[in-house]
Amino acid sequence: MKGKIFISFICALIFLVVTCAFLSHSAKEDKTKGHETAIQAAKEHGFASIDEVNTFYNRNVYYIIQGKNKKGEKIIGWMKKGNTDKILIKKAKEGLSKDDVLQLIQNIDNSKPKKIKKIMLGYDDTDSKKWDIPVWEVQYIDQQNRYTYFIVSFTDDRVYKMYSIKQ
């Protein structure tokens, strides 16, 4: 009797491990799906090397490609999923750096960060023409313990918006 219980336990444990491994692999694959297509398109649009590719979710899905052009200058590309013919490319020095954005949010009086969760390049494609632009998105916990999204234009630190949600 103890042998049957032990074998059943081992089988259940193996099933659980295999299921967890499958779910983990599937989730990771969804996160990086499309990166190879983005890399290929970026190379066709002037990227000599690729340092990083990230997926950004807004109204649409965007691939953010960071690398260098043939002159060795750091460049960033924003490509909408499924649109490999059109990539918005800017030199990194034309916009705000990650450090610039971190400094900017430290100066916000009513919503200073207590803990930064994530900072990443993205693309805001909301219905307003003002917001059809490359952006930096910062997710953080503010001093009032709210989960806050701070979205600022990649090229103009005066253009930003902020949302706070109670945890």
What are these model-derived regions, one by one?
Residues 51-96:
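Extracytoplasmic/periplasmic/luminal assembly and interaction segments
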Residues 44-46, 55-57, 140-144:
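Short, solvent-exposed secondary-structure boundary motifs
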